[in-house]
A protein has these predicted regions:
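Hydrophobic alpha-helical membrane-insertion segments
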Residues: 5, 31-32
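Bacterial N-terminal signal peptides
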Residues: 15-28
Length: 321
């Protein structure tokens, strides 16, 4: 076989170069198992963003109510605690007429002008548009054990929150009915009609609100539950069974939760969304005056804040405005 001078040498060098390039390429290609893992680890879908509507924002044409406080309060029922509270007074308040009442737990966050609930703004707008009655708002923090309420807490939770909010029984209901309403009632004309009293909250504040109405349906008959903690923190997971076993109470309730709210497939009693589903099912079975919305979020106030104006319209839908 004849050869061309220099070609064999050049061919050998080319073979070696191709071999080295092949090895280099193989070195950066992961094994199949790694390829599959990379394919599975796709970027997480962006979390849904709920935006506040104009009903939750200050409007030039809307008269602005007063937010008074914070005031300090030491309870004789929830012994050894001190807390803050604020009172919202709408511009349309007339002392000669009893005003409806909205009590909101975790008042430090519910009144935050930069938060996602912004309840005073919502009240300003809906009352002005006659989409809910003239309503006094009472926004209460959980209790802090001790003599002083630390200013450093800011929007954080006082240390007696879980005891007060997550516990079943009538202690917190008594605190609201026997202490807070009379305290605010010294200054403002509050309705004594339970149909004109609403109570709400988020997370543990939501189960707390339900407990107040459950224990005192002749004092409160409207409940707003946002991402409610109807879970086994302090026994709240039994509420669906209690609802089914007891005679229906005259309570209207709006339930909001997210499909990704604190999921616990290993312990359904601590799975927030499952427990909210069970609660809704029990309330439906007993034919409660119920409305509910399940969003796509997790354990966050974002969704509840975005729909709060609609919730309040529904809660007070048949009350004189």
């Amino acid at each position: 076989v004849s050869t061309v001078p220099g070609l064999t040498k050049r061919f050998s060098i080319l073979q070696i170069a191709l071999f080295v390039l092949t090895l280099s390429a193989l070195a950066v290609i992961p094994p199949k198992s790694r390829c599959y893992a990379q394919e599975a680890a796709k970027p997480a879908a962006p979390k849904p963003k709920y935006r506040l509507s104009s009903d939750s924002l200050p409007q030039e044409e809307t008269p602005k109510g007063k937010l008074e406080g914070p005031f300090l309060f030491k309870s004789k029922i929830l012994v050894g605690t001190v807390r803050k509270y604020w009172v919202y007074v709408p511009a349309q308040y007339d002392a000669s007429k009893p005003a409806c009442v909205l009590v909101f737990q975790d008042g430090q966050r519910a009144t935050n002008p930069n938060g996602v609930l912004r309840v005073p703004n919502v009240l300003d707008n809906l009352i002005f548009k006659r989409q809910m009655p003239v309503t006094i708002g009472i926004f209460i923090t959980p209790g802090q054990l001790g003599e002083e309420y630390p200013e450093t807490l800011g929007f954080s939770n006082p240390n007696n929150r879980s005891v007060e909010y997550d516990s079943l029984g009538d202690a917190y209901a008594r605190f609201i009915v026997e202490e807070m309403l009379p305290e605010v009632g010294k200054t403002y004309n509050l309705t004594k009609d339970p149909e004109g009293r609403a109570i709400g909250g988020a997370s543990s504040g939501a189960i707390c609100a339900f407990t107040v109405a459950w224990e005192r349906p002749n004092e409160f008959r409207k409940v707003i539950s946002l991402i409610g903690s109807f879970t086994d923190i302090r026994g709240g997971h039994v509420y669906p069974e209690l609802v089914r076993k007891n005679k229906r109470k005259p309570i209207r309730i709006f339930v909001e939760d997210g499909f990704d709210d604190n999921r616990r497939p290993d312990n359904l009693k601590r799975d927030w969304h499952i427990q909210n589903q069970l609660m809704v099912a029990a309330l439906k079975d007993k034919r409660y005056d119920l409305n509910y919305v399940f969003g796509e979020g997790g354990h966050s106030d974002d969704h509840g804040g975005a729909i709060l104006p609609d919730i309040l319209r529904w809660i007070f839908r048949d009350f004189e405005k």
